[in-house]
Design a protein with these regions (language model features):
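Amphipathic alpha-helical packing segments from all-alpha helical-bundle domains
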Residues: 50-67
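GST superfamily/GST-like fold recognition
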Residues: 26, 74-103, 114
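Residue-level signal for nonpolar/aromatic packing positions in well-ordered secondary structure
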Residues: 11, 64, 83, 114-117
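Extended, well-ordered alpha-helical scaffold segments
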Residues: 52-56, 103-116
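Short, structured loop/turn "capping" segments at alpha-beta junctions
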Residues: 22-26, 64, 71
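GST-like domain detector, emphasizing the conserved glutathione-binding G-site
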Residues: 1-51, 141
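Acidic/histidine-enriched, glycine/proline-rich intrinsically disordered or flexible terminal extensions
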Residues: 127-142
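Surface-exposed helix-capping loop/turn segments at secondary-structure junctions
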Residues: 66-77, 119-123
Length: 142
């Protein structure tokens, strides 16, 4: 998590940001609506929720891009749990084709490095029930 207290604090801050803010504003509005709502038999996705989630995702994408303009990894100059958490959330959204990769080149480059790691290969082979993955999902060099 980093050697100095400020580095560890930044890792924790980013993790909390994903687990609270990103989860509430993006994941619940897109993934919960598109994937889990139908599986639970709760009807069709709410277009209002999807729209809100997509607007929020663009804001979060801009923040990730800003972070990576100033650092090598999400929380600093070292790979950390913050990168793993970020990659996990983005992976699901990427699977669904929701991420605007054409707008966020630094984030795309960072994510391609994560997708290329041997530990990420199994994730790229997973399937979300009957939902097909986006065309580029399994390709680390998308």
């Amino acid at each position: 998590m980093g050697k100095c207290p400020l580095s560890r604090l930044e890792v924790r801050r980013i993790c909390k940001w994903f687990d609270n803010k990103f989860n509430k504003e993006v994941y619940e509005n897109i993934v919960e609506e598109r994937v889990f709502k139908s599986l639970k038999g709760l009807g069709n996705p709410s277009s209002e929720s999807l729209k809100a989630g997509r607007v929020n995702l663009r804001n979060h994408e801009n923040y990730l891009e800003w972070l990576l303009k100033n650092r090598t990894f999400i929380a600093g100059e070292f790979f950390s749990i913050a990168d793993i958490i970020c990659a996990a959330y983005l992976s699901t959204l990427d699977y669904l084709g929701e991420v605007g990769w054409e707008r966020i080149n630094l984030t795309k480059k960072w994510y391609a490095q994560i997708k290329s790691r041997p530990s990420f290969r199994d994730i790229l082979e997973e399937k979300l029930f009957t939902i097909p993955a986006s065309k580029h999902y399994k390709n680390p060099d998308f």
